[in-house]
Amino acid sequence: SFACQSSEVLEQAESKADLIGGTVAGLLSLVGVVADPLRSPEHIVLSQILEKAWSEGEDLSLETLISRLVDPPFKKVGVFPLDTFYPSDKRMELAMRLNSVLASSSFALWAQGEPISPADLCTPKDGTVPVSIFYLAHLSDQERMFFVALLLEKLLAYTRTLSGTTALRSLLYFDEVAGYIPPTA
């Protein structure tokens, strides 16, 4: 789900923009769309849908997001009418691609279990430091990128809500980063 973030995150313009941008980029990568956050109608409209929902304190499911892509809760994007900026047939095409992911049997597993909560992942329970391991080898490249993007965006948003400390609170270890972080010369 695309759960509404805490007020601490949403009140910080940079944090909110980073979270929305990363979430939308991850979602679009899942359906093979490479989108420029400043120029791509797909990215801009999905970002506005998320921002509107979260500013109203609303959690969105993928189903709701797809429905709102077909019939967005706004009529203008910038100064242009929505249908001029991103025509309804193009929105429907993207909605169909997202719906195909939602309807696939392999994606059904994503809807099961507890939603990922960085607070739950990082907070000691009964004096024991939690260890969480995410095994992603069975996922396609697009699914891995989607999951990693959402996880890292949620972790970053969570850490921005915490006060400073001199003690280590958590450690993120990312093994086998090939394909995520390009090598440098």
Question: Residue locations for each model-derived region?
Answer:
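P-loop NTPase motor domains
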Residues: 1-185
